[in-house]
C-alpha cells in the first residue's frame, strides 16, 4: 500500500551534529556518511526514505554533502545545537508547521511520524518512548519563533527548557527500539541488524 504523501508539512532532516561519540578504528567518524542497507550513506537512506512520506524533505547541516538534495545551511560553525537548525528552518521555509527528525534515528516508523504530524493544536508535538523524551522527533509550529529567538539570544541551548515552556505535548509510543539513536558504532551495528531483520520503510 502506498503511503499518502504529507504535502502540507515539510520535513527537515537535522544533520548538523558533531558525531562526537561515533568512533570507528579509534577515529571520530561522521555518522552521516556511514553506509546503510543498500544506500551509500545514512544521509541518503534517511533522505530517500522520508521522501516516500513527505513531498518536501530538506537537510539541515553545516555544509552540503555530495548527495543531491535541498540543504539548509546552519551558519554557526563552531556551535552545535539543533536550535540553530530549527530556527533557520522557520526563517527560511516560511511555513506554519515543520516536522523535524535527526539523521541518526533511521528506525522511526511512518505510522509514528504520521501520528505526530496529525496533531495540530500545540506549538511542539514530540515523541516519547518508554524510557525517554525524543524532543527532536517532533512537529513544530511557527509560534515557537519568539522562544527560539530568545533561547539563541540568551545562549540557552537546552531544548527541554524551550519545549517545557511552550504549549507542547508528548505522544507516547511503546516501542523503544524504533527510537534508537545512532550515537555510537555499537548503536549503528544494532540498527543494521534490525533493518536486516525487519522492514522499516
UniProtKB/Swiss-Prot annotation:
Its EC number is 2.7.7.77. The keyword Aminoacyl-tRNA synthetase does not apply. One of its GO terms (cellular component) is cytoplasm. GTP binds at residues 14-16, 31, 104. InterPro entries: MobA-like_NTP_Trfase, Molybde_CF_guanTrfase, Nucleotide-diphossugar_trans. It is an enzyme of class 2 (transferase). It is found in: Cytoplasm. The N-terminal domain determines nucleotide recognition and specific binding, while the C-terminal domain determines the specific binding to the target protein. HAMAP family: MobA. Monomer. Transfers a GMP moiety from GTP to Mo-molybdopterin (Mo-MPT) cofactor (Moco or molybdenum cofactor) to form Mo-molybdopterin guanine dinucleotide (Mo-MGD) cofactor. This is Molybdenum cofactor guanylyltransferase. The gene is mobA.
Amino acid at each position: 500500500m502506498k503511503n499518502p504523501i504529507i504535502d502540507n508539512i515539510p520535513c527537515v532532516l537535522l544533520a548538523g551534529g558533531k558525531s562526537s561519540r561515533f568512533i570507528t578504528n579509534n577515529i571520530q567518524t561522521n555518522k552521516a556518511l556511514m553506509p546503510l542497507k543498500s544506500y551509500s550513506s545514512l544521509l541518503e537512506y534517511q533522505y530517500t526514505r522520508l521522501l516516500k512520506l513527505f513531498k518536501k524533505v530538506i537537510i539541515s547541516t553545516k555544509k552540503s554533502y555530495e548527495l543531491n538534495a535541498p540543504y539548509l545551511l546552519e551558519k554557526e560553525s563552531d556551535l552545535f545545537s539543533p536550535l540553530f537548525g530549527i530556527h533557520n528552518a522557520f526563517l527560511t521555509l516560511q511555513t506554519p508547521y515543520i516536522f523535524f527528525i535527526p539523521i541518526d534515528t533511521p528506525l522511526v516508523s511512518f505510522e509514528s511520524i504520521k501520528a505526530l504530524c496529525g496533531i495540530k493544536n500545540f506549538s511542539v508535538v514530540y515523541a516519547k518512548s518508554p524510557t525517554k523524551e525524543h524532543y527532536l522527533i517532533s512537529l513544530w509550529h511557527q509560534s515557537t519563533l519568539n522562544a527560539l529567538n530568545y533561547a539563541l539570544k540568551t545562549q540557552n541551548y537546552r531544548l527541554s527548557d524551550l519545549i517545557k515552556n511552550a504549549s507542547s505535548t508528548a505522544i507516547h509510543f511503546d516501542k523503544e527500539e524504533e527510537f534508537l539513536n545512532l550515537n555510537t558504532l555499537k548503536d549503528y551495528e544494532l540498527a543494521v541488524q534490525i533493518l536486516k531483520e525487519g522492514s522499516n520503510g
